[in-house]
Amino acid sequence: MLKKEYLKNPYLVLFAMIVLAYVFSVFCRFYWVWWASEFNEYFFNNQLMIISNDGYAFAEGARDMIAGFHQPNDLSYYGSSLSTLTYWLYKITPFSFESIILYMSTFLSSLVVIPIILLANEYKRPLMGFVAALLASVANSYYNRTMSGYYDTDMLVIVLPMFILFFMVRMILKKDFFSLIALPLFIGIYLWWYPSSYTLNVALIGLFLIYTLIFHRKEKIFYIAVILSSLTLSNIAWFYQSAIIVILFALFALEQKRLNFMIIGILGSATLIFLILSGGVDPILYQLKFYIFRSDESANLTQGFMYFNVNQTIQEVENVDFSEFMRRISGSEIVFLFSLFGFVWLLRKHKSMIMALPILVLGFLALKGGLRFTIYSVPVMALGFGFLLSEFKAILVKKYSQLTSNVCIVFATILTLAPVFIHIYNYKAPTVFSQNEASLLNQLKNIANREDYVVTWWDYGYPVRYYSDVKTLVDGGKHLGKDNFFPSFSLSKDEQAAANMARLSVEYTEKSFYAPQNDILKSDILQAMMKDYNQSNVDLFLASLSKPDFKIDTPKTRDIYLYMPARMSLIFSTVASFSFINLDTGVLDKPFTFSTAYPLDVKNGEIYLSNGVVLSDDFRSFKIGDNVVSVNSIVEINSIKQGEYKITPIDDKAQFYIFYLKDSAIPYAQFILMDKTMFNSAYVQMFFLGNYDKNLFDLVINSRDAKVFKLKI
């Protein structure tokens, strides 16, 4: 009897659904932990390492906050939202720092089930919310970016807008004071947590205002909600924002009858003026300027150098095909179609769900803007599927017993989640670095000072700074073409040029931090170098760096290290592209070849490689299509660490080299095909062959996973 009473209590049922959905989400995320724990190479400092490259930026910021300081201009994320939250968790919990950054996403991202279930409950459809929560919490896209070890702001980037959506819907349905104050609170938190959410917040507030003007134009509380929410967009300190919002909320709550529409109109106008004066609309004006005056911007760019566009090399901003798009959002194509149908049906039944459109549309931008955006559509589409299933149950109950209906719903839910479970099982993401790589960088921390620089590719910037506590030229947040040019040049040109550019780029980067805003150092460091060295032709200036008699006039202020990991061989052609581009035209008109491969098959005296090259079994030539190309030399690498290799000359007039790696730390790089230009690059000569000018460099860390060289000039 007591159990029946509990089951009749809607609040207990709602609470039970939230707990079950939350536990389900957390449990699914622990699968990766269980799997990764089998590999010692994924551990560092007695804990699994994280799988998010950008996560090391926030980890560095949190580490510096715990230490209480950081170096000037070190690009540390000191004081950022995720770093701050991590800092406080470290201070108030007994867990290690490594454990906190590993599991934060596991537990915080699973909170998405709460607003989903609460929102559905506002429509008196708890089943809709429960099913939607199960699906949304583990759908492919959301899982990929919030799984255990994915230490990034993504862990709350969907949770917070779903709470905003919930309070908007609740405000529409209940018109209560709690929603009135909670709405600006969560918008403010969202803007603090993820500043890039500004546009989405503007869209949500704008749509809420339009909805108000159409359906609730005579109800004052809705206009106050818009005003309070808009104040969070202002570019002033949070405590001033909070004070203004609380005062206006209190005035409305206590003097509601005296606040007529004229006063509300004045408040609204004052809010708009305040936003303009405080810089709250600057992001919108920037977007308008960028898109409306694009031709002017392009003209400005042509006055300087035209660098390689980094967006061409980032998978997250590549277009995604429609099948993959559907799978990432709903787990499978069929569930996506049902979800879309269900969402349209939900809109017809409950017009307030139109407030979800900005979130849904942002997710659909993935079709043009890249797969990273799909994460936004996940919870909204899941609500559509949950609604469809709840309607399906209502139909079943009319024809069959409650038990039969429940069994059908459970079965349908399991079928829906089956593709997601398969995805979770197969999605075995490796840690960003291996244990050996992390240990090497930790070793570098004991060699280098905090003011020293490590020159390496931007993919490794954040982890290098975290483990070695040094500075870098580039990282996951600073990697425009003009930034990437310098490490690309130092890695892909000859040693002399690499050494000179490493010194110049570091010293000029440091100088740029203290230069006036209109100084050329702020806009283009390469042009600043040329100006100081009285050079007007960029090609002649860059060529002069290869000459031994090139004299560096810039004073040496710190030590510089070159970090060359084995894993960079997989992307080295991309790395080199940034400095082989024609800076006057922006065209990659200096062709080069560097291609890693592994054997797929051996037949008829030929080795078929994964990069499409067919190599003769005597290694004397290779075929690309119908073209047979001679090989200059075969280089057999017996030991990268010891620098043991054997060069077998074949045709000294040929342009291509074949590297056969018998000692490779990268499983999918057994062969490397390269031309003479790449063969003479600093990366190939110094890392693979161990050839370096001892007047320019010292080898301070040596392993087959990575090598670190200290610049001597």
UniProtKB/Swiss-Prot annotation:
Interacts with target acceptor peptide in protein substrate, as annotated region: 457-459
UniProt subcellular location: Cell inner membrane
Residue numbers on the Periplasmic membrane side: 36-96, 145-152, 193-197, 234-237, 279-324, 370-373, 428-713
Cofactor needs: Mg(2+); Mn(2+)
Motif MI motif, chain ranges: 568-575
Pathway membership: Protein modification; protein glycosylation
Motif mapping: TIXE motif: 313-316
GO terms of biological process kind: protein N-linked glycosylation via asparagine
Membrane topology per record: Multi-pass membrane protein
Residues bound to Mn(2+): D54, D152, E316
Predominant subcellular localization, coarse grouping: membrane
UniProt motif WWDYG motif: location: 457-461
Catalytic reactions on record: tritrans,heptacis-undecaprenyl diphosphooligosaccharide + [protein]-L-asparagine = tritrans,heptacis-undecaprenyl diphosphate + a glycoprotein with the oligosaccharide chain attached by N-beta-D-glycosyl linkage to protein L-asparagine
Positions annotated to bind [alpha-D-GalNAc-(1->4)]2-[beta-D-Glc-(1->3)]-[alpha-D-GalNAc-(1->4)]2-alpha-D-GalNAc-(1->3)-alpha-D-diNAcBac-tri-trans,hepta-cis-undecaprenyl diphosphate: Y194, P195, S196, Y291, R372, Y462
Cytoplasmic side: 1-11, 123-125, 175-176, 216-220, 255-260, 348-352, 397-406
UniProt motif (DXD motif 1) ranges: 52-54
Keywords of the record: Cell inner membrane, Cell membrane, Glycoprotein, Glycosyltransferase, Magnesium, Manganese, Membrane, Metal-binding, Transferase, Transmembrane, Transmembrane helix
A Pfam family it matches: STT3-PglB_core
Gene Ontology terms, MF aspect: glycosyltransferase activity; metal ion binding; oligosaccharyl transferase activity
GO CC annotation terms, alphabetical: plasma membrane
Locus of motif DXD motif 2: 152-154
Site features described as Interacts with target acceptor peptide in protein substrate, chain residue numbers: D54, E316, R328, I571
Task performed by this protein: Oligosaccharyl transferase (OST) that catalyzes the initial transfer of a defined glycan (GalNAc(2)GlcGalNAc(3)Bac(NAc)(2) in eubacteria, where Bac(NAc)(2) is di-N-acetyl bacillosamine) from the lipid carrier undecaprenol-pyrophosphate to an asparagine residue within an Asp/Glu-Asn-X-Ser/Thr consensus motif in nascent polypeptide chains, the first step in protein N-glycosylation.
Protein family: Belongs to the STT3 family.
Name by which UniProt lists this protein: Undecaprenyl-diphosphooligosaccharide--protein glycotransferase
Organism: Campylobacter jejuni subsp. jejuni serotype O:2 (strain ATCC 700819 / NCTC 11168)
Gene that this sequence comes from: pglB
